[in-house]
């Protein structure tokens, strides 16, 4: 059982390590949608135009929300 867990972790690690850096930029809407400051006030029906990125905004994106949030917009 322990060998199986180690094998699974190794497969996940190798998959992440071999991923190209540019894949994050090519997948524009991967992640959780968020509300940018330009989206207007909190009203039902407003679209969420930003995307939350865990490790900050990738190149070509900019931070679109004031504060410590990582809500980014292309």
UniProtKB/Swiss-Prot annotation:
Propeptide: 20-28
Keywords: Cleavage on pair of basic residues, Disulfide bond, Ion channel impairing toxin, Nematocyst, Neurotoxin, Secreted, Signal, Toxin, Voltage-gated sodium channel impairing toxin
One Gene Ontology MF term: toxin activity
Cellular component GO terms held in the UniProt record: extracellular region; nematocyst
Primary localisation category: secreted
Classification via Pfam families: Toxin_4
Coiled-coil regions listed: none
Domain of life assignment: Eukaryota
InterPro entries assigned: Myo_ane_neurotoxin_sf
Cell compartments where the protein resides: Secreted; Nematocyst
UniProt keyword Magnesium, yes or no: no
Signal peptide interval: 1-19
Cysteine disulfide links: 34-71, 36-64, 57-72
Similarity comment text for this entry: Belongs to the sea anemone sodium channel inhibitory toxin family. Type I subfamily.
Job of this protein: Binds specifically to voltage-gated sodium channels (Nav), thereby delaying their inactivation during signal transduction.
Full protein name: Delta-stichotoxin-Sgt2a
High-level lineage: Eukaryota, Metazoa, Cnidaria, Anthozoa, Hexacorallia
């Amino acid at each position: 059982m322990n060998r199986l867990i180690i094998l699974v972790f190794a497969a996940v690690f190798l998959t992440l390590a071999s991923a190209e850096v540019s894949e994050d930029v090519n997948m524009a809407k991967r992640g959780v949608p968020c509300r940018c400051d330009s989206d207007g006030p909190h009203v039902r029906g407003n679209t969420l135009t930003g995307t939350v990125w865990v490790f900050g905004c990738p190149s070509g994106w900019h931070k679109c929300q004031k504060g410590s949030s990582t809500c980014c917009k292309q």
